[in-house]
């Protein structure tokens, strides 16, 4: 089992016993009945005691959207910030305060529309923040417009004749930005969700988690193919590092590389065992993880969940601290007043 304290070496540790109740605020939870956000919140609150971090050293930053109400409901420091800018704010916190465990809560609209630029650069820089993207493939807060992840042809209030847009694949986007940790999970699979949260907390650097989240009001059953017991075994591909990739009701299907480096589903029994894929989440080159992400399709025929990529590299805050320390050793402590005064000043008159 991963140790969610490992990436928190500079964050204070508490020996005080914590429970889920300690991380519940006094605020009334105000999401629509049946919203998948309730399940995510409960899993998150029940996981937080594992971090053994004092509440005052835990910070949750969100943008704008239904999911972004989550900081109100967790008894810690938090910030309900500007639309799309949560990764930028979290970057400043994580880079300047390594004694904090910083989590970002965002949605498919907040992160991938107005916030897309901030998201990819936080991932590229490998800032030590954990980003949870609640993907319901719709704008819920503004009452049901299409989002950057809505499928092509989606009829909504803002696309009455069907969306013309090709949707973002959040996993492909994160891997393309060379995020060092990329995973997907589902709101209704609490055990899997908690396991992914644990692994993300254990990772030093930026962690990106896409969570399929059902919106029962404006996009109900958007992920029914991968959540209903009657269909999920045929379509969900569970990724476990070092394990053969098998799926299907009887585990009879596998994956292998086809032409041009793409992955294809094949009958495992009728294939050369050496050609079948064993999952390697630790591959340094992101090409393999990207190929996995391209299995996605609008009908969820083959949908991997789990950790796609877990390839550690130095985090931005570590590199920044080392650079500052080296500069201090070479030039001494800085003088802010002298810096502001500058060397090229003069008086007039």
What annotation goes with each model-predicted range?
Residues 116-123, 141-154, 173:
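Active-site-proximal loop->helix
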Residues 2-17, 26-27, 217-349:
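Flexible, low-complexity linker and terminal segments
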Residues 2-140, 194, 323-349:
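Thiamine diphosphate
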Residues 61-63, 105-106, 130-135, 210-212, ...:
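Short beta-strand segments
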Residues 180-236:
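ATP/pyrophosphate-binding catalytic subdomain of soluble kinases
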Residues 64-66, 136-138, 189, 212-217, ...:
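Glycine-rich beta-alpha junction loops
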Residues 19, 147-200:
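Conserved thiamine diphosphate
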């Amino acid at each position: 089992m991963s140790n969610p304290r490992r990436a928190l070496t500079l964050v204070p540790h508490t020996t005080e016993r914590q429970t889920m109740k300690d991380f519940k605020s006094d605020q009334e939870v105000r999401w629509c009945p049946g919203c998948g956000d309730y399940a995510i919140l409960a899993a998150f609150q029940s996981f937080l005691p594992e971090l053994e971090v004092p509440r005052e050293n835990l910070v949750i930053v969100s943008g704008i959207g239904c999911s972004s109400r989550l900081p109100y409901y967790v008894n810690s420091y938090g910030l309900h910030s500007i639309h799309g800018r949560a990764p930028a704010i979290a970057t400043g916190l994580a880079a300047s305060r390594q004694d904090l465990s910083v989590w970002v809560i965002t949605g498919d609209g907040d992160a991938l529309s107005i916030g897309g630029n901030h998201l990819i650069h936080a991932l590229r820089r490998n800032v030590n923040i954990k980003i949870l993207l609640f993907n319901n493939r719709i704008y819920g807060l503004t009452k049901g417009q299409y989002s950057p992840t809505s499928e092509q042809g989606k009829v909504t209030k803002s696309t009455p004749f069907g969306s013309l847009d090709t949707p973002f694949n959040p996993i492909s986007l994160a891997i393309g930005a060379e995020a060092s940790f990329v995973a997907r999970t589902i709101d209704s699979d609490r055990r899997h969700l908690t396991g992914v949260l644990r692994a993300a907390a254990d990772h030093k650097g930026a962690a990106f988690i896409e969570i399929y989240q059902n919106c029962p009001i404006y996009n109900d059953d958007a992920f029914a193919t991968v959540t209903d017991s009657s269909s999920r075994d045929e379509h969900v591909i569970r990724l476990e590092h070092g394990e053969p990739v098998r799926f299907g009701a009887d585990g009879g299907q596998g994956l292998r590389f086809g032409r041009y480096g793409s992955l294809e589903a094949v009958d495992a029994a009728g294939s050369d065992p050496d050609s079948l894929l064993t999952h390697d989440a630790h591959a340094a080159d992101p090409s393999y993880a990207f190929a996995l992400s391209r299995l996605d399709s609008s009908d969820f025929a083959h949908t991997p969940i789990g950790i796609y990529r877990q390839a550690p590299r130095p985090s931005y805050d570590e590199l920044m601290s080392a650079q500052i320390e080296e500069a201090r050793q070479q030039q001494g402590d800085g003088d802010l007043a002298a810096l502001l005064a500058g060397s090229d000043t003069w008086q007039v008159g």
